[in-house]
From Swiss-Prot:
SMART domains, alphabetized: STN
Keyword Cell inner membrane assigned: no
Function according to Swiss-Prot or TrEMBL: Specific receptor for the siderophore ferric pyoverdine (pseudobactin) M114.
Cellular-component GO terms for this entry: cell outer membrane
GO molecular function: siderophore uptake transmembrane transporter activity; signaling receptor activity
Protein name: Ferric-pyoverdine M114 receptor PbuA
Domain TBDR plug as annotated: residue spans: 160-271
Protein keywords: Cell outer membrane, Ion transport, Iron, Iron transport, Membrane, Receptor, Signal, TonB box, Transmembrane, Transmembrane beta strand, Transport
Record carries keyword Nucleotide-binding: no
Annotated source species: Pseudomonas sp. (strain M114)
Membership in a protein family: Belongs to the TonB-dependent receptor family.
PROSITE patterns linked: TONB_DEPENDENT_REC_1, TONB_DEPENDENT_REC_2, TONB_DEPENDENT_REC_3
Membrane topology (UniProt): Multi-pass membrane protein
Length: 826
């Protein structure tokens, strides 16, 4: 933050407290909006600013408060004008040019005094339309009005996308808002390079570059094990209302927390207290009784602005396009940031999320030959008494200290506890070809779930000079711990389901029925601990050439005690796994071809313990290992407001766990052979032309089994449900002239066909490719109010978003639907 906040004179503080504005200047006819004399004028001053887009008069006052500029303007001449958002580090003239861009307003400057004028000639500063790019974006995306970012933090420190020798997509706050992306599943469905797959037991799996992302989550850079052993596949109940952005890494993520997955990782960056007061109210209503309301407010809590707060309250209730399903979400979030000194900031936060839902899980079956039943999209084969109740509390804390201009320290911790109580039933079984009615088995389940996750991360980051060049060094350590204590039981219900004429009111059994008839289940007590130390060096070998070297040493321990039921009999199963001093290296090189283009290459090791799996002789399965290679070129234009990337990737993985066919109940595993995924990606994000924000990504993925314990599998496709071609596009265009209050958005999610191999007959169950088009139109009523209409699946494409087996797991994509939203900014 700016040190000038601590240098305000008493008179200035009084003016701020009493809102002294618009004092008349004799002979000029101009209003003095705000005069700050916090520090004497120094040529080419630089400030860190965070000023959202807002009425121009209000924005100029905020600029004066956050800098040492004395800004004079006529309020009447600014009526109806809106500023460009500022976010990041700016020199004084850069901030003025960016804020006034596109308004037709000019200014004159005399030392520390700025006089804002209307159209003029002579010495007045003429602002060309290209001056919108006169300032760089910061890492924070809120208020930037952009689909890209000036920096990512999923690695340590803050670096631009062009400086990062791996593939990272940032889903900015504007992107989340424009597309109404409120859950982690919705975000990942719109992220380039990510395939989303519905789990029959709820939640979704996420795939990147042919492999599943599992447990690789960070909160503000702190690693947690959420998702690695989570009941809801890779997703979890977390609303996007509390986050500034979501950073998605594709490729091996071992440097994030050691036991890195093959596919990638996700970093959730939460909203912070703002430097200026701002409140946003939003209401929306959509198809299938989808209602949502949100209040988001924040700002300084004391006169000097050294204490800043943020509060978000959200409630949503909705039905779904299928029978039975419903859901209610309540989210409460609070954050405080304390500037303990000009160089030290303490941040605290708390989030509470409550979900009460009637889910429709299990998906739909198919005919016994794998062909489509062509059921109505509204079909749900579950019972009306299905219930999921989830509560999640998350605590955040971090401390940032700036030692000097070059070196800084960050210490952060996160604690999260999630409890879930679930009871549900769904059918399992293929439909005989030609049947007019079915007598399909219904599986019922109860699940009591309690998971606690702890994460800690601390590092120092800085620059140093050596051999005539400036280099960067990061040294740190982190730890994560997860404790899962749950009980589940799965049993066949006495009643059957007619898939072709479903009954949603099959009697609900009591808990004793599940305990007496469980085909599988039992109590599970799981502990996972992981510790590690890491270092990353960015060495400038020459002006265009940077070598990035990283290494992490990890210690990992897992301990699971459980009772596994199979056909009414319980077996005690205890698994333990320990890995000590495991080294995960990373290497990358960047070569600046010119000011806009950088070529890069990177290598990452893959290491994932598999202590939860036992061999037939009772020993622990050895870890999954592999390597990830990436070669590409990145571009950055218009001072970072447009980013692009093209890369080739190859990932090799071996020894992943798979069921041992010698164990009838699938209770033991073997290490599989070797698999390969390779392909290429292309992505562009940001302002491609004036007033057009775009995020577009294309991914080509080819997977293959190179070696397998079953020799008949050599050479077949690995993860056949990952499409060969994947396209994600969304753009938002602001009209000009008489229609300058209107914005139009459009996009498409498209992919080629995929398939699953039947576990029964061995035949392929094919899923057709599809393209789903979405759109948006927005209108800004005035400086406070705006409305928007979003339409999803505009052409009402009928398709399966997930292909399962003959018995279950086939899910329709959402039919055409609309959401109308109204927002007010104060």
């Amino acid at each position: 933050m700016s040190a000038s906040r601590f240098m305000l004179r008493p008179l200035t503080r009084a003016l701020l407290m009493h809102g002294a504005t618009r004092t008349r200047l004799a002979g000029t006819g101009l209003g003095l909006a705000l005069t700050l004399t916090a520090a004497p004028y120094v040529q080419a001053q630089e400030w860190t600013l965070n000023i959202p887009s807002q009425p121009l008069a209000q924005a100029l006052q905020t600029l004066g408060q956050q800098t040492s500029l004395q800004i004079i303007y006529s309020p009447e001449s600014l009526q109806g004008l809106r500023s460009t958002a500022l976010n990041g580090r700016y020199q004084d003239d850069e901030s003025l040019k960016a804020m006034l861009n596109g308004t037709g307003i000019r200014y004159q400057r005399d030392g520390n005094t700025v006089t804002v004028l209307g159209p003029a000639t002579g010495s007045a500063m003429e602002l060309a339309p290209t001056n919108v790019n006169a300032s760089r974006l910061g890492a924070t995306t809120e208020g930037s009005n952009s689909y890209t970012t000036g920096g990512v933090t999923i690695g340590k420190g803050v670096h631009s996308l062009k400086e990062t020798p791996q593939s990272v997509t940032v889903m900015t706050r504007k992107m989340l808002d424009d597309q109404n992306l409120n859950t982690i599943e919705q975000v990942m469905e719109k992220t380039p390079g990510i395939t989303v797959y519905d789990s029959p037991m709820g939640g979704k799996y996420f795939y990147s570059r042919g492999f599943r992302m599992s447990g690789q989550y960070q909160y503000d850079g702190v690693p947690l094990d959420i998702g690695s052993s989570y009941v809801q596949a890779d997703s979890f109940n977390s609303d996007m209302a509390i986050y500034d952005r979501v950073e998605v890494l594709r490729g091996a993520a071992g440097m994030m927390k050691g036991a890195g997955g093959t596919a990638g990782g996700v970093n959730f960056v939460r909203k912070r207290g703002q430097d200026t007061a701002h409140t946003q109210l939003s209401l929306s209503a959509g198809t299938w009784d989808n209602y949502r309301g949100q209040v988001d407010t924040g700002g300084p809590l004391n006169d000097s602005g050294t204490i800043r707060g943020r509060a978000v309250v959200t409630e949503q209730t909705r039905q779904y396009f299928y029978d039975v399903g419903s859901r209610k979400d309540q989210i409460y979030y609070g954050a405080l940031d304390f500037d303990l000194s000009p160089d030290t900031t303490l941040g605290l936060g708390f989030a509470w999320e409550d979900v009460d839902a009637t889910p429709c899980w299990g998906g739909l079956p198919r005919y016994a030959d794998g062909s489509d039943l062509h059921l109505k999209r509204s079909t749900c084969l579950n019972t009306a008494w299905n219930n999921q109740r989830s509560k999640r509390a998350t605590y955040f804390a971090d401390l940032k200290h700036q030692f000097n201009d070059d070196w800084s320290l960050k210490v952060a911790g996160v604690y999260s506890r999630n409890t879930q109580d679930m009871e549900y039933a769904f059918p399992s079984g293929a439909v005989p070809v030609g049947a007019t009615a079915t007598n399909t088995l219904m599986l019922g389940s109860i699940y009591d779930y309690d998971q606690r996750d702890y994460g800690f991360d601390a590092y120092v980051d800085g620059k140093f000079d050596a051999f005539g060049q400036q280099h960067e060094l990061t040294i740190g350590a982190n730890a994560s711990r997860s404790h899962k204590d749950d009980f589940y039981a799965v049993a066949a219900l006495p009643q059957r389901q007619n898939v072709l004429d479903p009954n949603h009111h099959i009697p609900q059994p009591d808990e004793s029925y599940y305990l007496a008839n469980a085909s599988r289940g039992g109590p599970v007590d799981m502990h996972i601990k992981q510790y590690g130390a890491y270092s990353i060096a960015r060495l400038k070998l020459a002006d265009p050439l940077t070598l990035v070297l990283g290494s992490r040493v990890s210690w990992y321990k897992s301990d699971t005690d459980s009772v596994q039921y199979f056909r009414g009999e319980g077996t005690q199963v205890d698994t333990k796994s320990t890995e000590t001093g495991q080294v995960t290296p990373f290497a990358g090189v960047l070569f600046d071809l010119n000011d806009n283009l950088t070529a890069y290459a990177s290598y990452t090791d893959i290491f994932t313990p598999q202590g939860a799996y036992k061999t037939i002789d009772g020993s622990t399965l050895k870890p999954l290992v592999g390597q990830s290679y990436e070669l590409g070129i990145k571009g950055e234009w218009f001072d970072g407001r447009l980013n692009s990337t093209f890369n080739l990737f190859r990932t090799l993985q071996k020894d992943a766990a798979q069921d041992d066919p010698r164990c009838e109940d699938s209770s033991c595993s073997i290490n599989s052979g070797k698999v390969r995924a390779q392909g290429f990606e292309a992505e562009v994000s940001g302002e491609v032309i004036d007033r057009l924000q775009l995020l577009a990504g294309y991914t080509y993925t080819q997977t293959k089994v190179l070696e397998d314990a079953d020799a008949t599998q050599d050479g077949v496709v690995y993860n056949s449900y990952v499409p060969r071609h994947l396209l994600r596009v969304w753009g938002d265009y602001s009209l000009s002239g008489p229609l300058d209050r209107v914005t139009i958005g459009a996009g498409v999610n498209a992919q080629t066909g995929n398939y699953r191999t039947s576990p029964i007959g061995g035949d392929n169950i094919d899923g057709a490719g599809y393209a789903v088009w979405n759109g948006r139109i927005g209108y800004r009523i005035d400086d406070t109010w705006s409305v928007a209409l979003n339409g999803n699946n505009l052409f009402d494409k009928r398709y399966y978003s997930t292909i399962g087996t003959e018995g279950f797991g086939n899910f329709y994509g959402d039919p055409r639907n609309f959401v109308m939203s109204v927002k007010a900014d104060f």
